[in-house]
């Protein structure tokens, strides 16, 4: 069965390369495993509830980032994204705290 990918766009170029090729340059080596799990969850999700996985600490962002969601990667590092109509957009890998 052919499955459509949910992830449609990236802000962070190294995260995109990691997603497409598995090459982890540009992402912290100690974050690679968690990012791989989170990207896989995003890419198979149909709803935001599908991504509410223990350990990911999924939560909506507020203020200027309203409309975006966040996964905790490690410490202050987050995977942030918009989720609209069953697709993930503008994925970013950032230390935003």
Tell me what each language-model feature is:
Residues 1-38:
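Arg/Lys-rich, positively charged N-terminal/basic patches that mediate binding to nucleic acids
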Residues 1-5, 62, 70-97:
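Enriched for short, Lys/Arg-rich terminal
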Residues 11, 54-57, 92:
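A secondary-structure boundary/capping signal
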Residues 23-24, 44-47:
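Generic structural signal for secondary-structure transition and capping sites
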Residues 26, 67, 79:
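Short, electropositive, low-hydrophobicity segments enriched in small/polar residues
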Residues 38, 43-44:
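Basic/aromatic-enriched alpha-helical hairpins
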Residues 46-69:
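A short, surface-exposed loop/turn module that caps and links secondary-structure elements
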